[in-house]
């Protein structure tokens, strides 16, 4: 066994060899030494367990080849680009929607240059970082003022912490939502230091339920848009308009968490309707919060719009600094919002709407092209077809609504062959992510952004 151990090269010898010098120049001394030590430790363990030298230790070139492979893997960016063919357009686990070219340009410009982030150029003095984008948001929503934080959950937390710490918040039991990752409205309330008061039942809540719960310790009445589920059947809910009238009697504010949020009429685009921010503002809701990286089609952020006196209080709360956005996100968000000044161009300029509004004819053509490329790459174990599919918006938006779509389906007699194919797709330079259903592997083209790049990659694979 000692003879086997002596066959393992010393770290110093590997460092001084020509191959070692080359790898150190490319990857750095520390990284090279770490990988070399790991490889040597692996060899020692195999000698102890199996009384034999690993095959790669027989040739020095094989040792350096393995070190280089491991260094290359670790150098790769962990957030790899992927092709989304799941049929879920705004797939949370795949980064949701793509930014528009204008948003990318604005973000890149902010990265490369100083910007007037908290500086009033006209007055020549310090300002707050939301001031410029607030003016645009006010124009789009009709609100008195606006505040931007890093996501909608942060927006809800900030509103609760500012106005309800140590007080009670009244919410319908049917609106106590849980979003991805077991993140619940009651948990946010507990974190903000306020008490949740549930009213009504899961399926029915009346105006008098709210009225009966109001007392001297009530901070505000809250509406939560159930964007990721829908209760049907024997149901009753209270509208924002009704809640606003009730709140006025007790001089209380009404706060609405819209979740996905929309600044355009989805029905006009031929898509399922979703509550619009402007509608809630017009209904008299005091504060409305919504996401920016879902239906809005922008970067991850959360916007709060509403009464100026309330927004001013949010801006001055210490938590606002913790939750604020940087210059890159604010620049990208402003560029995204400017698209909404010209709603007739949304389907041409915002990738989210480009994907959602594709015609069946366009999708059929894409699916046929994808099938043709795959047919040239897959063997006889796989049967490919172009089939109708049902896509969805995703990210908790309109959970009960589907979009007609088209997919390439792959069938194999053996399930193991389909699993092997999925593994092959995931091993591509930019992995292809599909879904399993009905004993087939589905590649839904509605959610496939950068479609030409996808075909080119498959042609070259």
UniProtKB/Swiss-Prot annotation:
BP terms from Gene Ontology: conversion of seryl-tRNAsec to selenocys-tRNAsec; selenocysteine incorporation
Cofactor dependency: pyridoxal 5'-phosphate
UniProt superkingdom: Bacteria
Family per similarity comment: Belongs to the SelA family.
HAMAP family: SelA (MF_00423)
Protein name: L-seryl-tRNA(Sec) selenium transferase
Pathway participation: Aminoacyl-tRNA biosynthesis; selenocysteinyl-tRNA(Sec) biosynthesis; selenocysteinyl-tRNA(Sec) from L-seryl-tRNA(Sec) (bacterial route): step 1/1
Keyword terms of this UniProt record: Cytoplasm, Protein biosynthesis, Pyridoxal phosphate, Selenium, Transferase
Modified residues (N6-(pyridoxal phosphate)lysine): 294
GO cellular component, one term: cytoplasm
Function: Converts seryl-tRNA(Sec) to selenocysteinyl-tRNA(Sec) required for selenoprotein biosynthesis.
Catalytic activity: L-seryl-tRNA(Sec) + selenophosphate + H(+) = L-selenocysteinyl-tRNA(Sec) + phosphate
